[in-house]
Curated annotation (Swiss-Prot):
Superkingdom of the organism of origin: Archaea
Protein's UniProt name: Putative antitoxin VapB5
Cellular component, GO, one term: plasma membrane
Main location: membrane
Organism classification: Archaea, Methanobacteriati, Methanobacteriota, Methanomada group, Methanococci
Role of this protein: Possibly the antitoxin component of a type II toxin-antitoxin (TA) system. Its cognate toxin is VapC5 (Potential).
Keywords: Cell membrane, Membrane, Toxin-antitoxin system, Transmembrane, Transmembrane helix
Annotated coiled-coil segments of the chain: none
Localization in the cell: Cell membrane
Membrane-related topology note: Multi-pass membrane protein
Extent of the signal sequence: none
Transmembrane region(s): 3-23, 65-85
């Protein structure tokens, strides 16, 4: 890879990692709040269903949240970093994408 590609790539990966951690923290907080406010039983009239929780979805148990949350945050962060870098230096976004595509096709 050439020099102009390395610097935004490293900063994008670092910010993406922080965005993933923040997304998991937010999702755990929101799901914890929902679990604490919802009723704890599906069927209160049936005693044997007393300990069944209504909301059992969390990023650890729901595969779609495990996959989508980091993927969305990473892609949004990568796009915003590329846009900011290209606005800082004109025509950089085109050069960056051209360098990455030529690296992927030749290497």
């Amino acid at each position: 890879m050439q020099g102009p590609v390395i610097i935004p790539l490293i900063s994008t990966l670092g910010l993406s990692f922080l965005a993933i951690l923040l997304a998991y923290k937010i999702s755990f907080s929101v799901i914890g709040f929902i679990n604490s406010t919802l009723p704890t039983t599906l069927f209160p009239s049936k005693p044997y269903m007393l300990f069944v929780k209504i909301s059992t979805i969390s990023p650890l148990t729901c595969p779609s949240l495990i996959i989508l949350t980091p993927a969305l945050t990473w892609s949004l962060t990568a796009l915003s970093m590329a846009y900011l870098y290209s606005s800082y230096k004109p025509n950089t976004f085109f050069t960056l994408s051209k360098n990455v595509s030529s690296f992927l096709t030749t290497g």
